[in-house]
Amino acid sequence: DLDKKQDDLHEMLDLILDYVEEPQVEQEKPFAMLCTLLASDKYLGRCLVGRVEQGSAKVNDNVKAINLLGDKVESGRLTKLFKYEGTDRIPVDSVNAGDIICIAGLAETSVSDTICNEINETPIKSTPIDPPTMSITITVNDSPISGLEGKKVTSTLIRERLLAEAETNVAIS
């Protein structure tokens, strides 16, 4: 009933479950997932988030990343696997098609790259990331009031902050 005020979203979520089809997954095919998000962990480094489109994978499996053209970006090993359940990230030993996961072990892979087993040559279709539209040049501040406003304004600290942000932000390259 649209006129009645609701306390929660249960009715809407039930409608979504009733009318939205489940995603089609292919368990039999070799492992493949599309990287849709970058994450960073202070112990694991760069992590990649996405949904497993097909197959399954285990910790220590050898995988490769390929770009939208099918060119190899890098090879590596799945050092850690996490599965998302709601907003919780839970460490697991294996993942299957349909799971939303986070993986560690690939440092050069980015959003829109396909992570797959080593025999797969076909990338998952995705929208390419737009190239940067702006660039900046940072130079030494030779103003007479340099260093008087702000605490972290040295070039080294700014560089460290930009590199840290580039780990999880695809808009910075």
Residue locations for each model-derived region?
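Structural and coupling elements of P-loop NTPases
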Residues: 1-173
